[in-house]
């Protein structure tokens, strides 16, 4: 299997958007933490919201198979797909893909939500994505930030509402330095 190598991974991230180099460095560090903790060479991953492929490139490096879903597939994402053989891209709305995947009984080891960050979108994606997880699968996502009323607080609200067990301590919420989060399903 052709895998993206470290040099290619760095190149993809450096080319993704040179104006956000500092952000990408932080993003890569947090995603590396998440990947090292939860992904192995046999993992199957679904990523909702791929944008320019920064996180997608890391998932391809760590996992056996990656399905990427985005409403608009960028040229950079198509370029990444040509560098690896473990990436399948779907250009459609997340809700549409999730419902189709459920009807096809697809299952994933890890699902990463990074599309629409509004409360309703995140909540609906979580409820659908739960049905696609393998036993002991990981539901995760990006942009769980606190104290920012203008940006992405829909993620925080939706996660805590769907998983009230977090506040009781019955479910562990993993947090990473790039604002990624993860919950292990039993």
Where in the sequence are the language-model features?
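A short alpha-helical cap/connector motif
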Residues: 1-112, 116-186
